[in-house]
Amino acid sequence: MSTFSLKIIRVGITVLVVVLAVIAIFNVWAFYTESPWTRDAKFTADVVAIAPDVSGLLTEVPVKDNQLVQKGQILFVIDQPRYQQALAEAEADVAYYQTLAAEKQREFSRRHLLGIQALSQEEIDQASNVLQTVQHQLAKTIAVRNLARLDLERTTIRAPAEGWVTNLNVHAGEFINRGATAVALVKKDTFYILAYLEETKLEGVKPGYRAEITPLGSNRILHGTVDSISAGVTNSSSSADSKGLATIDNNLEWVRLAQRVPVKIHLDSEDQQYLYPAGTTATVVITGPNDRDPHQASPMTKLMHRLREFG
């Protein structure tokens, strides 16, 4: 074979290798930048801020931080003797006005039966007015009694649902004000994912699509279903002036960063058992209408999914 032929073969091989490399790099880049995935995803759950409806000293806190509690379980108790005394006083007032109202009712009935032949109309009207006044006062004391009873019931704060007590920052002996958050309750079986996907990747995301979730630092792959896509995000380029007119930012960057849009993903029920704290990070890949068969993925695809963990 001549030297010229060898040169042609070498050049051809080199060109072929370069072309294949360019194609591979292009495919990798397109796969990496256009496929619907993100490393910016967070585990989230329904969280209830537990705050008392009454004020007073904490007498009991029978739970511990990060404890799993059942629905209706006592979380803490507030100064019941004070509210028991208030209820007893209110019940005494109700009993007094019930007796007084019965007495005034008998007096009015007696005067009404006697009629204007024995009494003046003014005396009959006066008895009626006194009866109405006492009845109104009785209704008021009953309302106060019912409120005192409700306050006493609410001195015992119970878990509204099954979940984990977290950030418990109160202890027995402390004074707590009405409406002051004492603890957070993370509801069990309510965990979901908020994946912040770039707007350029939303074309491949639809409600009902399946998703793979890989917690940061874990090899376990969880599965879920896209529930919804956020209907809007903050417009940082525009604001309203005092007249209500839009104020537009005059600066337009040469490099425009894609806006991130929250996508809510519900975890499958079998994956709810793996407890990853709300707020921790995960990588999310939207696989389309169906789950991806891990055995059919090419080595390059597997490599790309692994590289996503590193950015």
UniProtKB/Swiss-Prot annotation:
NCBIfam families: PRK10559.1, RND_mfp. GO terms for molecular function: transmembrane transporter activity. Belongs to the membrane fusion protein (MFP) (TC 8.A.1) family. Keywords: Cell inner membrane, Cell membrane, Membrane, Transmembrane, Transmembrane helix, Transport. It comes from the Bacteria. It holds the Pfam family HlyD_D23. The gene is aaeA. One of its GO terms (cellular component) is plasma membrane. Forms an efflux pump with AaeB. It is found in: Cell inner membrane. Its main location: membrane. The chain crosses the membrane at residues 11-31. It comes from Yersinia pseudotuberculosis serotype O:1b (strain IP 31758). It is a single-pass membrane protein. This is p-hydroxybenzoic acid efflux pump subunit AaeA. InterPro entries: CusB-like_dom_1, CusB_D23, MFP_Efflux_Pump, PHBA_efflux_pump_AaeA, RND_pump_MFP.
